[in-house]
């Protein structure tokens, strides 16, 4: 019986940048903040971490630093996805080598593929390492959806243990046809409770960058049986979540963190600063929630 890598809230942590590269001192501070506030897992070098703008050397260095800084206090899941299967294998092997607890692998994007191609892509990655693999399905970004029947096939591979699912419409089918020890995590902060109600085990969250404790509570209250309290927390956070996705993520969450005094720097191009109008909406929302 495979155990979940984590249950609860994992943070899809941002990567703080300066003009010269990664701000490792700040990254260390953010990691300590997350662990202190009760986060259940740290997911590094994902979409929110802007891995797509990192050269391999930097990408690998961030994974290594995070693993060493966390030092087994919570599971570290390293984003190692690529639309080049061999490249994804290389990054995944490195993550395993430096001690990551699992890898997160997004579907190939731009060149896309067929469902058979998806199966072969993830199968080769999984066979190249021994640590657990979390599939990442985000069709709104990649233009490619892992169909439930393909997820079921992949879930039969021993170390493909979970999926971060952003297509909420197929969560029920995935959970109903996959093995009971296959874990489903929400990839949408506004749909955590619905996913948990269907049998999911947690969320890989953007909003946890600024409210890790509350994000943990959102999931923990549900899993502890207090569904009504979890529902109330989910609804209470909707306006904040809306503001955090008013522009392409992670633009707003980084802006929010800077407004909160965390000094995480800007996003890298092609991501740009928020429009003045949206920035003011975000700022007012943070004030409404008592975050600034």
From Swiss-Prot:
Site (Part of a proton relay during catalysis): 47, 110
Gene Ontology terms: biological process: diaminopimelate biosynthetic process; lysine biosynthetic process via diaminopimelate
Subunit structure and binding partners: Homotetramer; dimer of dimers.
InterPro entries referenced in this protein's UniProt entry, alphabetically: Aldolase_TIM, DapA, DapA-like, Schiff_base-form_aldolases_AS, Schiff_base-form_aldolases_CS
Binding site for pyruvate: 48, 204
Cellular component terms per the entry's GO annotation: cytosol
HAMAP family: DapA
Job of this protein: Catalyzes the condensation of (S)-aspartate-beta-semialdehyde [(S)-ASA] and pyruvate to 4-hydroxy-tetrahydrodipicolinate (HTPA).
Pfam families in the cross-refs: DHDPS
GO molecular function: 4-hydroxy-tetrahydrodipicolinate synthase activity
PROSITE patterns: DHDPS_1, DHDPS_2
Active site: 136, 164
Keyword annotations from UniProtKB, A to Z: Amino-acid biosynthesis, Cytoplasm, Diaminopimelate biosynthesis, Lyase, Lysine biosynthesis, Schiff base
High-level lineage: Bacteria, Bacillati, Bacillota, Clostridia, Eubacteriales
Catalyses which reaction(s): L-aspartate 4-semialdehyde + pyruvate = (2S,4S)-4-hydroxy-2,3,4,5-tetrahydrodipicolinate + H2O + H(+)
Protein name, UniProt field: 4-hydroxy-tetrahydrodipicolinate synthase
Signal peptide: none
Enzyme class, spelled out: lyase
Protein family per UniProt: Belongs to the DapA family.
EC number: 4.3.3.7
Cytoplasm listed as a keyword: yes
Intracellular or extracellular location(s): Cytoplasm
